[in-house]
Amino acid sequence: MDCNSVPIDTSHLPYCFTRFPVRIHKDKEEIQRFTLELIHATKKEDSKAHKHSLYKYAFGPDMNIYSLSWCEADLDKMKLLIDFIELTWAHDDVAEEEPLENAVAESERLCRAMYEEYDSEPVADNGFGMRIKRFRDIRDRMKAIDAVGWVEVRDATEEWLHIDAKLKNFESLEEYLNIRKVHVGNKITTSFIRWTMGIRLSKAELSFIEPYTDCIGVWLGLMNDYMSWKRERTQPTDRVVNSVHLVMNKYNLPEEAAIDMIRGVLVRQEGKVLEMSEDLLGRTELSTNMRMYIQNLEYYAGGLFYWHFLAPRYTKPQSFDPERAD
């Protein structure tokens, strides 16, 4: 039952080609207010990071990524989710522009912040040190609310923080997508669906549903690559993690042909997800929690597509020039 969200009509957007349902949290104004308040409180005013963060939310409450992606979340838990995701996004944005060796080392240190036994480790008096302190604080607050659910979030985050070490020159799109489904953060974001809604699944249920969530992870990686290529193609980095770039090099394709190819793969992957959804929901033995989870995975996918499709972060990407933010 959908208690916290309302549907969004996308029929007036002819190029919005997803078939996933799109919904938005009924408390979208409060979620937007909290998001902006957090950005102002944690980032230096007029800094590059501050401007880039604000740009993500420039279209107001109707385009808040949290309201769209976790549309059925408990509001109090949603605020902790926002704190957690904004911090991991900040780390990811910085790590993308760091040499790979540095990024892997910083990810390892951030990972240790999820475990109390490392709290005695000193932290530097800089931006990274502040992220470590914030991560420890968020960890404690999440555990206080739901310690069991926190373990699932922690384990998914740990896998994601270590994924950069597996990046390489991939031999095939299939090999790339097997890593990309983790690299894109799908396991973290889907664990947050369960955590924010109090959905408890057994280990057997999580194992049973994993092929479906992996299928969504592949779709999410392709969708993010397709939507973000315009932004990422000029990003200063020693590694480009994007399937458009991969097929351009693998098949010696011009850029537009590579973009069209990835769009085709994306559409076919969405079809696979929807077929699996229909098959799973047709099974009479599924628990109520499992049905709720599958339905909200579709909402999550639809909300993320809608946000990527319209967000200024991707439709009008900002400059990566350190002296500019537009």
Stretch-by-stretch model annotation:
Residues 1-326:
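Alpha-helical, largely C-terminal catalytic domains
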